[in-house]
């Protein structure tokens, strides 16, 4: 018996092609795509506006399968983290961050990461494999279901019948975080007046485990689904890819699927960045800054976001801040300063709060929009740099850095 094809692996063009190979018209592919992504449906039998003969054929040849959540942890600030089984003893993590006017989902692109950035928990596990498109978009698909964010077929503009899978009783109460005065500026849209139209998940950031641009094809397939009106219909401005700086892939992303861009910078000069972000040895800062300028020619935003983790007595001096001002002088940008989030045996400490404030002030005085990320979810190891999952390392070793989490 043939292994069923997972339809979550296809963007709309891929699904249209797959349907055409079976003698089906393009509109049938779009119908099924709406059921999968808008409504979170997995049972072809429930797709009531799809011909019964096609439903039967799909039940034989296809499936809709997202990663399975094997752990679910909720922080005191409302942040929610899932450990997701992706097979072969590998697990990745996704994080939902609720805020007053938006909900941001941080998703992973690889099981582990080969780039081995010095301050990142994921990199210390080594690398196993790229996630499939289904495993990437499946994180958004699953989070929508678990958070009650899937639309109701009965209430859709297409008039599709069927059960209401959008159980609003499961929607996470964003007010829990608000009551504590929690903020997370660097996850925010730069358009605070924008409304997210009642979506539970209004923004997606590719800032989880792995280097997204090292898994280019599968990530772009997932991005296209996020943007597609037949699937999630997110604005390009509300989808962000974060990269450590793989320059050729940045150029490809600009040409094929330009979304908001964040760059993990973390140092103002090549000597220091070579130590902290080893990919810099291949694509040094001069090439990276030029790639950022090229990206802005087609980007949905008129700036690049530079992420900068604040490491005590490593990259946080006034001189480092002034060097950054010079480095980015010709690149329209904003900075997110990220207080380092500790993990076992990292060898780094977080910069003191006063030093972070002074560092930010130098950037702001130079006219650079600068925010300091409010740490979210660190009590469940969901904060930036703490995502670890479980990875069977094919490059060096097998290390598990997951701490036990309370199940919901």
Curated annotation (Swiss-Prot):
Its GO biological process terms?
Answer: rRNA base methylation; tRNA methylation
Q: Which stretches make up the Radical SAM core domain?
A: 99-379
The alphabetical list of record keywords is: 4Fe-4S, Cytoplasm, Disulfide bond, Iron, Iron-sulfur, Metal-binding, Methyltransferase, rRNA processing, S-adenosyl-L-methionine, Transferase, tRNA processing
> Which reaction(s) does its UniProt entry say it catalyses?
adenosine(2503) in 23S rRNA + 2 reduced [2Fe-2S]-[ferredoxin] + 2 S-adenosyl-L-methionine = 2-methyladenosine(2503) in 23S rRNA + 5'-deoxyadenosine + L-methionine + 2 oxidized [2Fe-2S]-[ferredoxin] + S-adenosyl-L-homocysteine; adenosine(37) in tRNA + 2 reduced [2Fe-2S]-[ferredoxin] + 2 S-adenosyl-L-methionine = 2-methyladenosine(37) in tRNA + 5'-deoxyadenosine + L-methionine + 2 oxidized [2Fe-2S]-[ferredoxin] + S-adenosyl-L-homocysteine
Comp. bias intervals (Basic and acidic residues): 157-178
**Which Gene3D superfamilies does UniProt cross-reference here?**
1.10.150.530, Aldolase class I
Look up keyword rRNA processing and say if it applies.
Answer: yes
Binding site residues for [4Fe-4S] cluster: 113, 117, 120
* GO molecular function annotation: 4 iron, 4 sulfur cluster binding; metal ion binding; rRNA (adenine(2503)-C2-)-methyltransferase activity; rRNA binding; tRNA (adenine(37)-C2)-methyltransferase activity; tRNA binding
Region Disordered: list its residue ranges: 152-196
Q: What is its EC number?
A: 2.1.1.192
Catalytic residues in the record: 93, 384
The UniProt note on the cofactor reads as follows: Binds 1 [4Fe-4S] cluster. The cluster is coordinated with 3 cysteines and an exchangeable S-adenosyl-L-methionine.
SS bonds (residue pairs): 106-384
Misc. comment: Reaction proceeds by a ping-pong mechanism involving intermediate methylation of a conserved cysteine residue.
* Protein known as: Dual-specificity RNA methyltransferase RlmN
Native source organism of the sequence: Aromatoleum aromaticum (strain DSM 19018 / LMG 30748 / EbN1)
